[in-house]
Curated annotation (Swiss-Prot):
GO MF assignments: ATP binding; lysine-tRNA ligase activity; magnesium ion binding; tRNA binding
Needed cofactors: Mg(2+)
EC number: 6.1.1.6
Designated name of the protein: Lysine--tRNA ligase
Signal peptide residues on this chain, from the entry's feature table: none
Cofactor: how bound: Binds 3 Mg(2+) ions per subunit.
Encoding gene (name): lysS
Superkingdom of source: Bacteria
Length: 561
């Protein structure tokens, strides 16, 4: 049967239930146990043994085996599964006053996917299956759409993300991933709160996007008649709180960056930023180790983990090594020895480092060498310390290494997991760096930061020495759940709508008809479309975006298929 036929048949069952006086969409149900509790409590029950303990349970029917006077359902709730042992005579006797044909209606009107409540006692069948020996049942929710027969496999990845609710129903391990994610974030908050850190919320809508080199999402406030940005970091507002007298603050929340999508990047992601007055990046390294090892031990019960086939030992202390030393270790290039930009460029080219020609400083080339030749090789936890000043506009100058800043990034399994500075507190130096960033922004660098005058004003009131830390929550969850893609740890990752890709189009100038074929197979014909619109569509860098903005809703149309 097609999905449409199945849905029609189930709608008919909904009507039959209503005719029987049964509401197929109940209001509530009182359970006494979850499946896992019953499995644990009665684990020692022997085959054929029954106890008279009355229980009530609810869940989704995941499997049905129906015989003449007997049926077996597999019921699944949030904690696991348990079998329902359904015997005609027992159910008919218990439910005689409610429904004289209760057992037959159970057989005829329920389907896999329905949500069922059941009351009864506990028994273990002769085959050893712990079961609820049902006396009464209630259909709590009638499912209209069938669950997929086969959901695993790469061919279904996009659908799993797009219909996460179905993914969660049929894949218990996916539910476990998000349960662990919740445990991880709760553990991080608990660790910090136990050390007197205070979580304070900062604005998501901001008049100046700052705190990171990233392209922001832009929106508009109608009442205030002003352009606003979704935050790309929480840094600058948390630092304002440090200026205001708080000594330990953090925020765990959503960040938005209008950038590419990959297995490691999602435009909307979660991070935590932590700031501590009178601390530096050495203190932040200790804090980072403490947070991650404590959470890993609490959630997984071990510091020895496996990620995509790689064994990772999270036992502290973690390696601490400078970017210069790592680049020298993996490429043989000693960037301390280069006296001129041309010398560094020549060495970089010979080492096969891409993008060297566009680099304007030795520090930029050093960073390119690190990203190209080193980053992916850092499998075990490694603090990469002391970065070039050119790529760290918010970090304090290194106290003993000119041209460098006191910054570290934590790499695990070849990915940046955390970023930290001894924060820049000199307002004059900070202004110079932000103005240099603003010049790049004016020249077309979409990721460069602007000048946040209010933040600079705050610094001029005086910010104490401060250590700052940012941890990517999604990447940390990926690590601790052995998830290959960031989309596996975000419940509802951003996806392009199905059918939004324009596969082909043609234009008939005599009738001004524009025919569009989408990747979903749908074909639409739009009428009285000026030639100029078709020409603009030809030249649009994103035809789907142009369609949604300038064609959809602007012209009359007819769907051909």
């Amino acid at each position: 049967m097609s999905e449409e036929d199945i849905r029609a048949a189930r709608l008919e069952k909904v009507e039959q239930l209503k005719q029987l006086g049964t509401n197929p969409y109940a209001y509530r149900w009182e359970s006494t146990h979850h499946a896992a509790q019953l499995q644990e409590k009665f684990a020692d029950l022997t085959s054929g043994e029954e106890v008279e303990t009355e229980v009530a349970i609810a869940g989704r029917i995941m499997a049905r085996r129906v015989f003449g006077k007997l049926a077996f359902f597999t019921l699944e709730d949030e904690t696991g599964t348990i079998q329902l042992y359904l015997e005609k005579n027992r159910i008919q006797e218990s439910m005689a006053e409610i429904d004289a044909n209760a057992f037959n209606h159970l057989k005829q009107l329920t389907d896999v996917g329905d949500i069922l409540g059941a009351k009864g006692t506990i028994k273990r069948t002769e085959k050893g299956e712990l079961s609820v020996y049902v006396k009464e049942y209630t259909i709590l929710t009638k499912s209209l759409l069938p669950l997929p027969d086969k959901w695993h496999g790469l061919t279904d990845v996009a659908k799993r993300y797009r219909q996460r609710y179905v993914d969660l129903i049929v894949n218990p391990e996916v539910r476990q991933t998000f349960r662990r994610r919740a445990q991880i974030t709760a553990g991080i908050r608990r660790y910090l709160e136990q050390r007197d850190f205070l979580e304070i919320e900062t604005p998501v809508l901001q008049s100046e996007a700052g705190g990171a080199d990233a392209r922001p999402f832009v929106t508009y406030h109608n009442t205030l008649e002003m352009e606003l940005y979704l935050r790309i970091a929480t840094e600058l507002h948390l630092k304002r709180l440090i200026v205001g007298g708080f000594e330990k603050v953090f925020e765990l929340g959503r960040i938005f960056r209008n950038e590419g999508i990959s297995t490691r990047h999602n435009p909307e992601f979660t991070s935590i930023e932590v700031y501590q007055a009178y601390a530096d990046y050495n203190d932040m390294m200790a804090l980072t180790e403490g947070i991650i090892t404590t959470v890993a031990q609490d959630v997984l019960g071990t510091l020895q983990i496996t990620y995509q086939g790689e064994t990772v030992d999270l036992t502290p202390p973690w390696r601490r090594v400078t970017m210069h030393d790592l680049v020298k270790e993996y490429t043989g290039l000693d960037f301390h020895s280069f006296q001129t930009l041309e010398e560094a460029k020549s060495a970089g080219k010979n080492a096969g480092i891409p993008g060297v020609d566009e680099a304007q400083t030795i520090g930029k080339i050093l960073n390119l060498a690190f990203e190209e030749k080193v980053e992916t090789k850092l499998i075990q936890p490694t603090f990469v310390i002391d970065y070039p000043v050119e790529i760290s506009p918010l970090a304090k100058p290194h106290r003993s290494q000119p041209g460098l800043v006191e910054r570290f990034e934590l790499f695990i399994v070849g990915r940046e997991t955390a970023n930290s500075f001894s924060e820049l507190t000199d307002p004059i130096d900070q202004r110079e760096r932000l103005e240099a960033q603003a010049a790049k922004k004016a020249a077309g660098d979409l990721e460069a930061q602007g000048v946040d005058e209010d933040f600079l004003t705050a610094l001029e009131y005086g910010m104490p020495p401060t250590g700052g830390l940012g941890i990517g929550i999604d990447r940390l969850v990926m690590l601790l759940t052995d998830s290959a893609s960031i989309r596996d740890v975000i419940a509802f990752p951003l996806l392009k709508p199905e059918g939004s890709f324009i596969k082909a189009y043609r234009y008939e100038p005599t009738t001004q008809t524009l025919t569009l074929e989408f990747d979903s197979g749908s074909i639409y014909e739009y009428f009285k479309v000026p030639l100029t619109v078709k020409e603009e569509l030809d030249n649009a860098p994103s035809k789907g975006q142009y369609f949604h903005k300038f064609i959809k809703g602007q012209f009359k149309y007819e769907q051909l298929s």
